[in-house]
């Protein structure tokens, strides 16, 4: 059954527009609370609510609290905390569920609601459908004796900081390193600099002055120019860029070069292989560069592809019992350290890997150079049989590129567009293949 409200990462949209309105979020909290009560019959469920720094977080938090408590669910509020911190505390405090109020890397005018089940794992499709089924039902507040309580806890930041530090090798520290940390004026603005400082690094903080409106604004993992300039200006060894909710990572070296999620995953995997740690393999996505796949296999590391989205990477990791995965966008999963993507922990794993390899980031990543890619968006008509139109040309291009390139065709889920991506060892091969396929699709 198709979901009505939940997307691939919870419920998200523009604040003030359905579904990110206080009345809908009230119903969402109530519906989720009802499902929790049904599944947790032995005691009154307790849910943890965290948020990023968007101005709308106050409004949406209040609506969620009202909905949960009306359903008879207790609520613990942490205030601003990264998404992976909410997942960790949900698990560490043995709570029934966790909720993060954030729209990740989007502008302040958007917001969203993301749920975690018991243990800090993402909700299953089945539970999301259960919640959706109850949203449109009439709200029936519990009798006063059964209403939930809400309270704020202190020390959530400190618990999460200690957890992050515990993922770094106990025999090592970061003394001697100068780091610029860009927290995107988001959920990690307070905790991220402290983690690296307490491990011994000299830290220069930027993107650490949220005002409710400046989250992700010309800063963070989706806008690294500010960080690149700060690294050069401060003569730092590395720059660390997080996104608004703290689950993505990009890094910058001392020369101002940016390293995306694919490069950082390679560094971590190579170091684990060097240490003889069995990670099983690495899960990327259909968009992961083929050159990285080849480089990993040269290190003796297996590789497979999932659909785009950290949710699907996580599914493959769990199915295969592998430990490392992620996307070029900076979602990196180290399953032996945390059960969700975590920008701070991922950065610590990269820095630990560089110590293991006794090399800097540029040297390790020189092992492979991304194959050139050509991407073309082709507009189509509703109901157009573009697969049939491109079948013969697609087969030709794939045969020509066998072993030295690949093709990805993806229909957009939000607009009438087919995305054609061809990558190959040589840029002209990629360009020629993409143009031929795009012409075949658009010729109808």
Curated annotation (Swiss-Prot):
Broad enzyme group: isomerase
Organism: Neisseria meningitidis serogroup C (strain 053442)
Cited SUPFAM superfamilies: Phosphoglucomutase, C-terminal domain, Phosphoglucomutase, first 3 domains
Family: Belongs to the phosphohexose mutase family.
Cofactor(s) for this UniProt protein: Mg(2+)
The record's free-text note on cofactor binding: Binds 1 Mg(2+) ion per subunit.
Binding site for Mg(2+): 104, 243, 245, 247
GO MF, any single term: phosphomannomutase activity
One matching Pfam family: PGM_PMM_I
Enzyme Commission no: 5.4.2.10
Name of the gene encoding the protein in the UniProt record: glmM
Function: Catalyzes the conversion of glucosamine-6-phosphate to glucosamine-1-phosphate.
Post-translational note: Activated by phosphorylation.
Active site, per annotation: 104 (phosphoserine intermediate)
Keyword list, A-Z: Isomerase, Magnesium, Metal-binding, Phosphoprotein
CDD domains in UniProt: GlmM
Signal peptide: none
Post-translational modification Phosphoserine, affected residues: 104
Protein name: Phosphoglucosamine mutase
GO BP, sorted A to Z: carbohydrate metabolic process; peptidoglycan biosynthetic process; UDP-N-acetylglucosamine biosynthetic process
One GO cellular component, as annotated: cytosol
Catalytic activity annotation: alpha-D-glucosamine 1-phosphate = D-glucosamine 6-phosphate
């Amino acid at each position: 059954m198709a979901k009505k409200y939940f997307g691939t990462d919870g419920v998200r949209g523009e604040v003030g527009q359905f579904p990110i309105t206080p009345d809908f979020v009230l119903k969402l909290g109530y519906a989720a609370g009802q499902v929790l009560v049904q599944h947790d019959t032995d005691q009154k469920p307790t849910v943890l609510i965290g948020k990023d720094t968007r101005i709308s977080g106050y409004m949406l938090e209040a609506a969620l609290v009202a909905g949960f408590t009306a359903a008879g669910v207790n609520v613990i509020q942490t205030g601003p905390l990264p998404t992976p911190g909410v997942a960790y505390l949900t698990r560490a405090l043995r709570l029934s569920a966790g909720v993060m109020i954030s729209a990740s890397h989007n502008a302040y005018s958007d917001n969203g609601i993301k749920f975690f089940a018991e243990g800090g794992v993402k909700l299953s499709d089945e539970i999301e459908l259960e919640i959706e089924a109850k949203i449109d039902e009439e709200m029936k507040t519990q009798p006063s004796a059964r209403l939930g309580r809400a309270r704020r806890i202190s020390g959530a930041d400190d618990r999460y900081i200690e957890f992050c530090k515990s993922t770094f090798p106990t025999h090592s520290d970061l003394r001697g390193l100068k780091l610029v940390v860009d927290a995107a004026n988001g959920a990690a603005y307070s905790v991220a600099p402290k983690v690296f400082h307490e491990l011994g690094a000299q830290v220069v903080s930027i993107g650490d002055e949220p005002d409710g409106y400046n989250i992700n604004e010309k800063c963070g993992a989706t806008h690294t120019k500010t960080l690149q300039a700060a690294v050069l200006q401060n003569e730092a060894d590395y720059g660390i860029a997080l996104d608004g909710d703290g689950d993505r990572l990009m890094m910058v070296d001392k020369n101002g070069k940016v390293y995306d999620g694919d490069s950082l995953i390679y560094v971590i995997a190579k170091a684990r292989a060097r240490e003889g740690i069995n990670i099983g393999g690495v899960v990327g996505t259909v968009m992961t560069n083929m050159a990285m796949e080849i480089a990993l296999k040269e290190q003796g590391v297996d590789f497979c592809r999932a659909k785009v989205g950290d949710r699907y990477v996580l599914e493959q990791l769990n199915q295969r019992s592998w430990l490392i995965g992620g996307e070029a966008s900076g979602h990196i999963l180290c399953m032996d350290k945390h059960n969700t993507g975590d920008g701070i922990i991922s950065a610590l794993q990269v820095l630990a890997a560089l110590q293991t390899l006794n090399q800097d980031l540029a040297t390790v990543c020189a092992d492979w150079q991304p194959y050139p890619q050509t991407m073309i968006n082709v507009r189509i008509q509703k109901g157009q049989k573009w697969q049939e139109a491109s079948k013969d040309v697609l087969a030709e291009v794939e045969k020509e590129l066998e072993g030295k390139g690949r093709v990805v065709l993806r229909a957009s889920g939000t607009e009438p567009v087919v995305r054609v991506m061809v990558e190959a060892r040589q840029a002209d091969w990629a360009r020629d293949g993409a143009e031929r396929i795009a012409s075949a699709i658009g010729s109808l």
